[in-house]
């Protein structure tokens, strides 16, 4: 029995199976078609305006040299033969949704998909180019190559378009019943169907191995992330916090911060600013007004001027009293460890300049010797057991924490000691200290008005990111 059909009819018959079934089902379909005297050549092509496409051609004798036509440029025959209709009924033909396909689940919004088909030397052949497209193809029986962006059904052309995403969930593609001009679509709405991984398949008719993999350059990935579609989807998500900030800091105000900046400020405040900041300040300011910041009746205020040695002793003594009497006062502890670090730096410079102490051994310089003398004066159990090692380690830990808080103060202002959340404060006391501050410049970030409200409202855009930079020396 001889069958007459067009390339468009073959495309409408085969493309849905390329999208719906896995490799074994595709090979079985090819074998079934071959039993009816049908063999198909499949060629993959790429056009910057259209994307990936498939071209089908009936297997003909060597004397027939007809040129392949791209499936997107073929006129559909209105009259279809009985064989084609019977094949549709036999195989339960339907048009599946792209998101329901199990074979191609890696769907990305890319305008210029780069799907490279690498062939073995036995399967490589030259094909005639189609209109507006240079086709570099190969001859196989049927293999699950990248499907095109549109395919023919028994009635008309169905185009699969990607809809904008909402969050991490992508909506189902829209099925259109008119001929779609893919080149006129925005770049972010052209869909690219890429295989999930590198795979090697065997062509069912010729037994050839086809190596299929996709490559994507770094430049294209950056262009996709910087596309207007990506920014529009992010801005489309409604966040109530920027809505509250917009009237004060948004566009049109004296600060004139963009919507993106307002979103960042909202996210940062949720993670790095304590949620009870207003209530905390109201309660503490009342107490500090009555008793003083350092509670002078219990803890003497550390010396802010004078020699480094005296300042170091005062700061360390203050820390010891805070831990023994007021362990819950975290604000005072943060200030004290910062003063301990600054006093230690000043004392080290003075000791190096004086050079009064001689090095006693490897790794033990002036600073180590002086610290041991100070700790022995402050702790009565200095010479008991391993208490000497304990006090040394404790002193250097406090000094290290002070240096870390000082890093935050230099970037964010001294107000961070008051408004820091427990999550950010806990990162300071983690060993090793893994934190990086990304401070994104804005037009008003260095203005006096911005610096004035920076500690309380975080209107200078910043964020603490762990596992980015290890400050082991802190």
From Swiss-Prot:
Principal subcellular localization: nucleus
Biased composition (Polar residues): 132-153, 222-240
Annotated Low complexity bias: 120-131
Keywords: Nucleus, Transcription, Transcription regulation
Compartment(s) of residence: Nucleus
One GO CC term, this protein: nucleus
Region (Disordered): 114-153, 207-242
Composition bias type Basic and acidic residues, residue spans: 207-221
Function per UniProt: Transcription factor; part of the fragmented gene cluster that mediates the biosynthesis of fusarochromene, a tryptophan-derived metabolite closely related to a group of mycotoxins including fusarochromanone.
Family: Belongs to the POU transcription factor family. Class-3 subfamily.
Protein name: Transcription factor fscB
Organism from which the protein derives: Fusarium equiseti
């Amino acid at each position: 029995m001889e069958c007459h059909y067009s390339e468009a009819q073959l495309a409408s018959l085969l493309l849905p199976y390329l999208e719906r079934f896995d490799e074994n089902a595709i090979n079985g379909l090819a074998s079934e078609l071959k039993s009816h005297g049908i063999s198909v050549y499949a060629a993959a092509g790429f056009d910057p305006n259209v994307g990936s496409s498939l071209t089908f051609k009936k297997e003909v004798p060597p004397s027939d040299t007809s040129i392949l036509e791209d499936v997107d440029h073929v006129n559909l025959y209105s009259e279809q033969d009985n064989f084609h209709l019977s094949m549709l009924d036999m195989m339960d033909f339907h048009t599946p949704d792209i998101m329901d396909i199990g074979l191609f689940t890696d769907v990305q919004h890319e305008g210029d998909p780069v799907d490279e088909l690498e062939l073995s030397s036995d399967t490589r052949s030259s094909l005639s180019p189609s209109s507006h497209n240079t086709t570099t193809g190969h001859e196989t029986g049927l293999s699950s190559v990248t499907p095109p962006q549109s395919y023919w059904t028994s009635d008309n052309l169905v185009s699969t378009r990607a809809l904008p995403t909402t969050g991490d969930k992508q909506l189902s593609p829209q099925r259109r019943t008119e001929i779609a001009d893919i080149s006129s679509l925005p770049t972010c709405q052209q869909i690219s169907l890429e295989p999930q991984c590198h795979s090697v398949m065997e062509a069912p008719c010729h037994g050839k191995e086809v190596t299929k993999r996709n490559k994507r350059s770094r430049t294209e990935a950056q262009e996709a992330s910087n596309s207007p579609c990506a920014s529009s989807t992010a801005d489309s998500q409604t966040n109530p916090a920027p809505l509250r900030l917009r009237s004060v800091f948004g566009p049109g105000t004296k600060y004139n911060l963009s919507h993106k900046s307002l979103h960042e400020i909202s996210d940062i405040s949720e993670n790095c600013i304590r949620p009870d900041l207003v209530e905390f300040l109201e309660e503490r300011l009342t107490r500090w007004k009555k008793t003083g910041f350092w509670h002078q009746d219990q803890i003497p205020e550390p010396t802010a001027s004078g020699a480094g040695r005296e300042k170091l002793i005062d700061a360390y003594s203050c820390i010891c009293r805070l831990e023994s009497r007021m362990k819950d006062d975290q604000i005072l502890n943060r200030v004290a460890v910062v003063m301990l670090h600054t006093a230690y730096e000043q004392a080290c410079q003075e000791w190096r300049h004086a050079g009064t102490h001689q090095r006693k051994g490897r790794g033990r310089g002036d600073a180590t010797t002086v610290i041991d003398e100070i700790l022995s004066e402050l702790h009565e159990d200095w010479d008991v057991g391993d208490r000497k090692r304990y006090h040394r380690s404790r002193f250097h830990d406090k000094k290290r924490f002070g240096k870390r808080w000082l890093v935050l103060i230099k970037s964010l202002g001294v107000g961070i000691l008051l408004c820091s959340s427990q999550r950010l404060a806990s990162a300071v006391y983690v060993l090793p200290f893994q934190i990086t501050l990304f401070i994104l410049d804005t037009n008003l970030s260095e203005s006096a008005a911005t610096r004035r409200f920076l500690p309380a409202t975080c209107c200078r855009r910043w964020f603490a990111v762990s596992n980015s930079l290890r400050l082991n020396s802190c």
